[in-house]
Design a protein with these regions (language model features):
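Short, intrinsically disordered N-terminal pre-domain segments
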Residues: 1-4, 133
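Auxiliary, metal-adjacent structural segments of Zn-dependent hydrolase domains
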Residues: 6-66, 72-76, 116-131
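Hydrophobic (often cysteine-bearing) scaffold residues that line and stabilize catalytic clefts
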Residues: 22, 80, 84, 103-106
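Acidic-and-aromatic substrate-binding clefts and catalytic sites of carbohydrate-active enzymes
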Residues: 77, 98-99
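Active-site recognition of the HExxH zinc-binding catalytic motif
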Residues: 81-94
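Hydrophobic recognition helices of helix-based DNA-binding modules
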Residues: 90-91, 114, 118
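Short, function-defining helix-loop hinge/capping sites that tune catalysis or transport
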Residues: 93-97, 112
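An active-site-proximal "capping" alpha-helix that borders the catalytic cofactor pocket
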Residues: 102-116
Length: 133
């Protein structure tokens, strides 16, 4: 498992917003939930997606390496939720799930459950007072 970070990072450590620590902690958290991710090479690229249809998307190259593009101006909550959603797509690709409707349905299902679980965990680095209800 290798996690790379690239792009135009908008780091604000004071409110734990999308810093590399959060990204790596979230990836470790997801690997605990879905061990198949441990075998993946993933790059998280923060980029301006203002003119795109969503907050993030996932690609896989010919070498089997995954590239997750994620909007660089999201709130902490949206960043965590979006990265979880895209990492679920990585898991699905590794498992061979190709049906787009099933992929999106499962990703939306997990993003809600796992974002709450991650934010309540010590891995998030989020102070208890800032954990969304």
């Amino acid at each position: 498992m290798t996690l790379f970070t690239s792009g135009d990072w908008q780091v604000d450590v004071s409110d734990f917003n999308k810093d590399r620590f959060t990204t790596h902690a979230l990836f470790d958290f997801m690997c605990e939930r879905f061990p198949i991710l441990k075998d993946a090479d993933v790059e998280v690229n923060q980029v301006d997606l203002t003119n795109e249809y969503g907050y993030g998307f996932c690609q896989v190259d010919e070498d089997g390496e995954f590239l997750i593009h994620i909007h660089n101006d999201l709130s902490y909550e949206d960043y965590v939720t979006t990265l979880i959603h895209e990492l679920v797509h990585v898991k699905q690709t590794l498992q061979g799930l190709k049906d787009d409707e099933m992929r999106e349905s499962e990703a939306y299902f997990w993003e809600h459950i796992l974002s709450k679980e991650f934010n309540a965990s010590p891995l998030s680095g989020t102070p208890i007072s800032q954990i969304p209800a």
